[in-house]
A protein has these predicted regions:
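Hydrophobic h-region of N-terminal signal peptides that target proteins for export
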Residues: 14-23
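Short hotspots in intrinsically disordered terminal tails
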Residues: 1-2, 340
């Protein structure tokens, strides 16, 4: 009897220990939710992406999980679409397209491309893998972003500052005059963050963001191909809430008879991955939820991110956020990865 009781006690203790370990379980590097906050997984993303015309991956620029999943999704789309894949990225600007084409077609060496192209400081760790994948498979890769010198002009002088540029220069950006909607939430937030800053930056910084969004949308649309998926990588703020690039893409596509099937993915940070926080609901068709203490490939400041990380808004104070934003958005801030937009 005593032996049975001891056995039961040991079994009870063992069961509790197992339950405690199980409760801790694996520590997931990410969780996926759909826009309504329901649990999803990578397979759901891939299935939806295969059926889309354009897929936006809104990343956090220095997050390793984002970069790894971008590469995996590109590989799986390549296989699932029998090679019918086009890739584009915010991180490469229009005046780099010729160099990019030469590298993709093996006309020039990788080291020559990397030496001559304007690349972000985290290019080798974060973006080279997907560019190299495209090169190895002979995929079309589109440098979608406006050259930063032109967005810097807008940041200084407003959209009117582009009136004097020539036809060749205009070919590297969205058609002018630009349709700009200051009431879009993504632009209003930027304006609020730099309100009261010098040199009309509160007014012009959202316009600089808009010319980037419009240019990326324009060159995505110019390269969309029936039966192909156009997979575009950009900072999350550029496509969150189906605004930014997505809004311009829909505007430019209105002249076409066929509506584009657009899928958006965004990355957010949360301390608790068990459920999607209310503020992150509806940001995209799929939300990639990453631990708040995830290690980063570089400090955000090292690549010139001007706006605060994903999830930080004007209503969520960040130490010296406004001062830091203004400093990084200064007229001569053309160095670094991104001179006048967010992550």
């Amino acid at each position: 009897m005593k032996i049975d009781m001891k056995i039961k006690t040991y079994i009870g203790i063992f069961t509790i220990m197992v339950l405690l370990v199980a409760a801790k379980g694996d520590r997931p590097a990410y969780r996926v939710f759909n826009g309504k906050g329901h649990a999803a997984d990578y397979g759901d993303i891939l299935k939806a992406a295969r059926n889309a015309d354009v897929v936006f991956f809104g990343e956090s620029h220095t997050d390793p999980i984002c970069h790894w999943l971008e590469l995996q999704l590109a590989k799986d789309l390549y296989e699932g679409k029998n090679g019918h894949l086009i890739i584009g990225a915010e991180m490469l600007e229009r005046d780099n397209q010729l160099l990019l084409n030469e590298y993709i077609s093996s006309m020039i060496r990788k080291k020559d491309f990397e030496a001559e192209a304007k690349l972000w400081p985290n290019y080798k760790t974060d973006y080279a893998p997907i560019v190299d994948f495209a090169a190895n498979k002979g995929l079309k890769f589109i440098a979608t972003n406006i050259p930063r010198r032109y967005s810097a002009i807008v940041n200084l002088k407003g959209l009117e500052g582009l009136d004097s540029i020539n036809a060749l220069e205009r070919g590297m950006m969205a058609p002018l005059p630009l349709k700009y909607n200051p009431e879009l939430a993504c632009y209003k937030k930027i304006g609020e963050m730099v309100a009261g800053s010098p040199m009309h930056m509160g007014e012009n910084l959202p316009k600089a963001q808009a010319i980037k969004d419009a240019t990326m949308a324009w060159f995505i649309l110019k390269n969309v191909n029936e039966g192909y998926v156009f997979f575009h990588i950009n900072g999350s703020y550029h496509s969150d809430n189906h605004e930014g690039i997505v809004w311009y893409l829909k505007e430019y596509n209105k002249r076409n008879a066929t509506e584009l099937k657009i899928l958006t993915i965004t990355a957010v940070e949360q301390n608790d991955l068990d459920e999607l926080e209310k503020d992150n609901l509806g940001k995209a068709d799929f939300i990639l939820c990453i631990p708040g203490d995830m290690t980063q490939t570089q400090e955000a400041s090292a690549i010139g991110i001007a706006m605060p990380p994903a999830g930080i808004t004007p209503a969520t104070p960040m130490k010296d956020a406004k001062a830091d934003t203004i400093k990084k958005a200064a007229p001569d801030s053309g160095s670094g990865g991104d001179d006048d937009d967010d992550d």
